[in-house]
Amino acid sequence: MPPVLPKYLAGVINTPWKGVVILQVVIQKIPENLQEFEILAVKGRQPEHICALLLCALSLFDKNMTDGVNAMNLLRGPKPMTPYDAQFLRDRLRGKAYLPLAYFEGATPENGYQPRVPYRLNVLADPRPQDMEPGYLLVFLKTAGADSPRPMKLRQKASTGEWFLWEYSSILSGIRIPAAEDPWA
């Protein structure tokens, strides 16, 4: 039996994986600054693009906190970052510049989480979308650094139909450290 697709996926070409729909986003370059991020962000507000943009914003945050906060605010919409949110990101990313890249295809602990270029992100749709309240969407991101895909929740702004970040703390949870940094490897 084919998986039940969220309404926004109707008509989208996708690839099934173990009964779960996978949407792939391809990025040629990870933004180096806010201006590059904004150009990339114009390409779409679809949920799978928001997932890829989150990883780009986290990478940017690690390089330049101000640009990273501004990028995150673009993704969070009407719920901007608080100082607590910025501190949470700083704590989770400290010493882990590899973390945002770990979700792209080809990134493994063995290669220091250096993904192949172009950057490909596979977004797994919720296998049980009927359990999600209207206006919200649960998706999952897979990394070679964890045993199971990590969830993130998006929220749709009813007046515009745009999707925004809502809950993404699992994406920032610890993963296996790169093999080069692992004294037990």
Per-region residue spans from a language model:
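Core segments of small alpha/beta cavity-forming domains
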Residues: 12, 16-105
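Intrinsically disordered, low-complexity, charge-dense segments enriched in Lys/Arg
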Residues: 2-3
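Short beta-strand edge/turn micro-motifs at domain boundaries
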Residues: 142, 147-184
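Surface-exposed, charged secondary-structure patches
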Residues: 86-147
